[in-house]
Every structure is written in C-alpha cells, then in structure tokens.
C-alpha cells in the first residue's frame, strides 16, 4: 500500500509538474503571438505610389518604426480611381486614410461626407498658392507643363495661346481628362485661360493632338519613342532624366499665362477603424522623413521643403511665373459640363 501510495504520489507529482511545464510552454507560445498582434492602418493610394519606383516601401518602413502598427496599402489605378472606390465603398470602406487625391477632385471627394476634418493648424507650406482646407493636407505638388527634347524642338511655344493658335505648331500628346489627373488638369488649364472660348480652342488644337491616352505613363512613353514633339507632363519631369539618366536635353515649357498646378492630398476617413493611427499618419505626411522622399521618390515638389533643401536634379528646373488653380467647388460643379464641351470639340 505504501509503495502503491508512493507510486501514486510520484505519478501525481510528475503529472502536476508536466501540467505546469505544459502551461508554461503554452504560455510562452501564446504570449509572443499576442505581442505580435499589432493594429493595422489601411491607407488608400494610387498604385504607382507604392510600386517598384515609388516612395511607398520606404514610407511604410519609416512609419512602422514609430507607430507600433502595421501599415497596409489599398490601391487604385490613379486619383480618380481613389475617388470612385470611396464612393463605391461608402461607409463600409476599409481605408483609414486616403493619400494621393488630386486637388481638382477635392470638392467632389469632400461632398461625399466620408472625410474627417484634419483639425490642425498646418505649418508654413512651400507652395505657390495659399492653403486653407480644413479637410485636406497637401503632401506634394507640381506645375503641369509640356515637356520636349530641346535637340529636336528648337523653338517651343511660349504660351498656351501660341500652342493653340499656331496651325503648324508642335504635335502633342495629352491625357484623357476623364481618366487622368494631368488630363483633367489640362482641361482646367484650357478653361482658365480660354474661358467661354475653350471649346473653339480645343477645336483649333485638335489636329495637332496625336492621341488622348488613358494615363500619364502611356503618354510619356509614346513621347520618348518620338511619336510627338511635346507631351503633357510636369516641370519636374526633366529632373528624372537628369538624376537617373544623366540626360539634360529634356525641358519643360513655362507659359506666359501661367501653368496649372497639380496638388496631391491626404485626408483621414470619417469611418476610420483606427482614427488615432490615422491622425498620426496625417502628422507624418508633413514630417521631414516623409517630405524628403517626394522630390526623387515621386518626382514632385514637397509641400514642405526638407532642411537639406531640394536635390541637385531640381536646381535647373523652370519655374513658371504664375500658378493657376481653380477653386475646388467650382471644379466640382463645372467638371462634367467642361468634359462634355471637350468631347464635342475634339470628336472625330
């Protein structure tokens, strides 16, 4: 009996020790897993921003270093795609933040009621226009411009009117304003300069428009293949050729009437699942570690110039004398009618 009891106690002790050990091991396995469960911030942006050559990867790493979270990207093809997805998803959107909305779509985006006020007094921004939006925070910007190869085009037009009025002027490639942010920008540029004569101006220019492309990359690729004398792009585009290819023959034309602005915006979603992280990301957008990646990461001017200044590739870029930008609400109310005007004037 004694031996039996001893045996039982021994077995019981071993079982207890085994149970404790099992619980300790199980705890050791569970605790790190729990520790690794971080909140996820979902940022909706356009695909090239997070693509192979965009700044997205570096920005994700930099934000995750300090946020104690995981940053996940939700992508659409372009700025217009971001707005369309916002409207489609509505209150059920997975996004906490939208990043990369074109300012020309800001009025329409704000009218959805899906965006939250940023609630900040923004620092001084290095932009050619004053900024007062209570919803949107700009993170980069650029002037739209026609880019050309100075070894092939010796006398580029010096104004938009000259480009439109010269029947023997350069052949150009532009983007479709229904599917492209720069294309929409050019539509507004024509409207701002030509007013109620925008339709006739399009009709004059149409014979020298090689094609309207869906997006910027298609247009620029055709230009580089020699399909046109000029392409609608940005004054910052030559910086890429300088920095990446050591080529200096690509130039951008500054027009006498001024050049239209392209401004990219960030905003927090009112329906954000992670509102505190969304607020931190909006702060991050204007930080040094975000802004310093814009010039040679997104090939645009930063909204707030980093302490180190702009890279050398930006030092010779043309600076237009005037920046054009139509009020958000006016664009929201007029865009569809102006596109109809463009369609009627350019249809073949």
Features from the language model and the residues they span:
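Periplasmic-binding protein-like
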Residues: 128, 142, 202-206, 212-213, ...
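Short beta-strand->loop
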Residues: 115-122, 134-138, 161-164, 230, ...
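An extracytoplasmic/periplasmic, membrane-proximal ligand-sensing/linker region
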Residues: 198-199, 302-348
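Mature extracytoplasmic/periplasmic domains
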Residues: 269-323
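A bilobed periplasmic-binding-protein/Venus flytrap-type ligand-binding module shared by bacterial periplasmic
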Residues: 145-152, 191, 262-274, 293
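Short alpha-helix C-terminal cap/hinge motif
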Residues: 57-73
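Extracytoplasmic ligand-binding site segments that recognize negatively charged/polar headgroups
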Residues: 38-40, 44-56, 78-81, 93-228
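A ligand-binding cleft/hinge motif common to bilobed small-molecule-binding domains
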Residues: 104-108, 224, 228-249, 298
């Amino acid at each position: 009996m004694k031996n039996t009891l001893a045996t039982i106690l021994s077995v019981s002790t071993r079982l207890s020790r085994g149970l404790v050990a099992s619980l300790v091991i199980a705890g050791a396995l569970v605790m790190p897993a729990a520790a690794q469960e971080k909140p996820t911030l979902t940022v909706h942006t356009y695909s090239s921003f997070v693509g192979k050559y965009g700044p997205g990867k570096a920005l994700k790493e930099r934000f995750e270093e300090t946020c104690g979270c995981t940053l996940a990207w939700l992508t659409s093809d372009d700025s217009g795609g971001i707005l369309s997805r916002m409207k489609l998803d509505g209150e059920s959107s997975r996004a906490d933040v939208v990043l990369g909305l074109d300012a020309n779509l800001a009025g329409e985006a704000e009218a959805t009621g899906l965006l939250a006020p940023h609630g900040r007094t923004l620092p001084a921004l290095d932009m050619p226009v004053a900024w007062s939006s209570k919803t949107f925070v700009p993170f980069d910007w650029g002037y739209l411009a026609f880019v050309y190869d100075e070894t092939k085009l010796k006398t580029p037009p010096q104004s938009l009117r000259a480009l439109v009025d010269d029947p023997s002027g350069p052949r150009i490639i532009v983007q479709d304003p229904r599917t492209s942010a720069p294309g929409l920008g050019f539509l507004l540029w024509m409207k701002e300069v030509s007013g109620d004569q925008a339709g006739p101006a399009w009709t004059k220019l149409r014979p020298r428009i090689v094609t309207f492309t869906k997006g910027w990359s298609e247009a620029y690729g055709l230009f580089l293949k020699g399909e046109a004398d000029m392409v609608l792009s940005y004054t910052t585009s030559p910086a890429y050729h300088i920095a990446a290819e050591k080529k200096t023959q690509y130039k951008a034309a500054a027009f006498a009437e001024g050049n239209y602005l392209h401004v990219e915006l960030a905003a927090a979603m009112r329906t954000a699942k992670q509102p505190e992280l969304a607020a931190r990301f909006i702060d991050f957008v204007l930080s040094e570690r975000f802004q310093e990646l814009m010039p040679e990461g997104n090939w645009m001017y930063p909204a707030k110039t980093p302490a180190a200044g702009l890279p050398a590739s930006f030092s010779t870029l043309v600076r237009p004398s005037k920046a054009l930008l139509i009020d958000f609400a006016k664009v929201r109310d007029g865009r569809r009618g102006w596109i109809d005007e463009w369609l009627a004037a350019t249809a073949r």
